Amino acid sequence: MKNLFCCILLFLGLQTAVVRAQTDVIGVYLTWQRDPTTTMTVNWVNLYPATPATVWYRDSREAEWKSATGTHHAAVPSSLQVRRVELTGLQPDTLHEFVLAEKPGPEAKGVRRFRTLPATLNRPLRFVAGGDMMHTREYVDTMNKRAAALEPDFAVLGGDLAYANGVDASRWIDWLQSWSLHARDKDGRCIPMIVGIGNHEVKGGTNYDIPAAAPYFYGFFALPENRSYYALDCGDYASFLVLDTNHTHPIPGDQTAWLAGAMASRRHKTFLFPVYHWPAYGTTKGPEGLLPCEHPRSIEIRTHWIPHFERHGVSAVFEHDHHNYKRTHPLRGHQRDEANGITYLGDGAWGVGTRSVPKDAWYLAHAEPRRHLFHVTLNPEGTIQVDAISGSGTVFDKVTLTKPRTTPVAP
């Protein structure tokens, strides 16, 4: 009888843990550690160390559920519990369903959905992009809803996500809740994210003590190559090079050497987008009497990174931090080049208060203090459509890039 009683208690404890895993989740978010055409990493955060790190999933066209179990750790210094399960061997461009912790019954409650990316670009691929996300919950909720309404394949988020400065777990709770609630399309499909680091992820803005300098960024996200600068390749057609503008890694040195090799090995990719936080061609924060592009960190980016962009060719560059809207003229060699210049898009105003913009910046084609996101369409024929969209849904600027990448130019 005593053994039976113990078994009942154990069963009830496990059942309670499973129920908690479903009902007390703070946030669910999808990322990639590798091939987005055949994998998906499911992450979720709650407060309970004992709940299982298990995901049940299936191709939405099939009846049978499979399970995968991953890892669990605390997002120190908080007590938030992070669970992470990488699903592999998935079919490209396919809708999948998943449930946390408990195998679904006939009713299949708590089901979420995601879609893998296509292996070959045989349809338009759409993503949203932006950064500097959450001064207030109202701001980030508005833009997350707008992003979901566009039904993108994924989101590219260029840093300053929760404005937690490496110390405030409560802001991450807000950010995770907002994304989980609102970054889902009308059919309940969750939008995966590609994330970069910004100064507000880091204690002091710049700090090379990894991961302690940015414990929540490194705790919440399993990054390709296990660092804040990395490449993510989408099938045979696109690559994103996510960089760290001197937040937890310096710009020159190892990161620049890695960038040179990463770009050289991706010459065959149709589309290639660098993504980073601090802008080379900004809209504010200029030294006294000078344009923003003359800030020392902007000069450092132009000195070490942009020569590689120009040498190998890119599709466009995403920059952030300055809390405005920006689209530059096509630029090459630090001057306008309408024939073969690079367009820089920014400046990080997803969900923040905006700032004034310079009226006489020679490199700016369009700049204004407006919260926005970019809606980007990669077309199979090689063109790129970029729409700038406000929280109310207004398309207030747009550009069509007629070449998939700028033509490489030898130094």
PLM segments and residue spans:
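Metal-dependent phosphoester/phosphodiester hydrolase catalytic core
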Residues: 24-357, 364-370, 375-410
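Bacterial N-terminal signal peptides
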Residues: 6-15
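Boundary at the C-terminal end of the N-terminal hydrophobic targeting segment
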Residues: 19-23
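Positively charged n-region of N-terminal signal peptides that target proteins for export
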Residues: 1-4
